[in-house]
């Protein structure tokens, strides 16, 4: 096969794969964003559900923070809280693979992240209504 044709086919195939991966990531972003908005943006959702989804919120923010239109102040607060959350998770002592009971800081950091999630969700709803 002619090297030029081979290289052209390889480039077209690579662009196709990159486009497909980008579309899948965008679909995943939209799906997860809607799910987290339904958890943190709905006042009828109980606090236990919000606490159970803190890890998902942290993962989502880590992965897609550049796609979220947050104010600089809200973005800085989110970065600070997530840094603290990760530090506390790193310090957590595991007993038989599960975190030990007790501790003061982790529940406090989780509370702050839940409040931040609610604030980000309400900000997103306001922007959606405003546009």
UniProtKB/Swiss-Prot annotation:
Its main location: secreted. GO terms for cellular component: extracellular space. One of its GO terms (biological process) is defense response to Gram-positive bacterium. Residues 1-23 form the signal peptide. InterPro entries: Turandot. It is found in: Secreted. It comes from the Eukaryota. It holds the Pfam family Turandot. Keywords: Immunity, Innate immunity, Secreted, Signal. A humoral factor that may play a role in stress tolerance. Requires Mekk1 expression in the fat body to regulate response to septic injury and consequent immune response. Belongs to the Turandot family. This is Protein Turandot M. It comes from Drosophila simulans (Fruit fly).
């Amino acid at each position: 096969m002619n090297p030029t044709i081979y290289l052209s086919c390889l480039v077209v195939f690579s662009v196709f794969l990159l486009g497909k991966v980008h579309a899948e990531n965008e679909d995943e972003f939209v799906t997860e964003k809607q799910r987290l908005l339904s958890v943190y943006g709905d006042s009828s959702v109980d606090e236990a559900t919000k606490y159970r989804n803190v890890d998902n919120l942290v993962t989502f923010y880590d992965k897609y923070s550049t796609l979220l239109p947050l104010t600089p102040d809200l973005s800085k607060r989110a970065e600070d809280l997530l840094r603290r959350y990760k530090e506390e998770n790193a310090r957590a002592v595991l007993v038989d693979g599960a975190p030990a009971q007790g501790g003061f800081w982790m529940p406090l950091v989780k509370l702050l992240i839940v409040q931040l999630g609610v604030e980000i969700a309400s900000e997103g709803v306001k922007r959606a209504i405003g546009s």
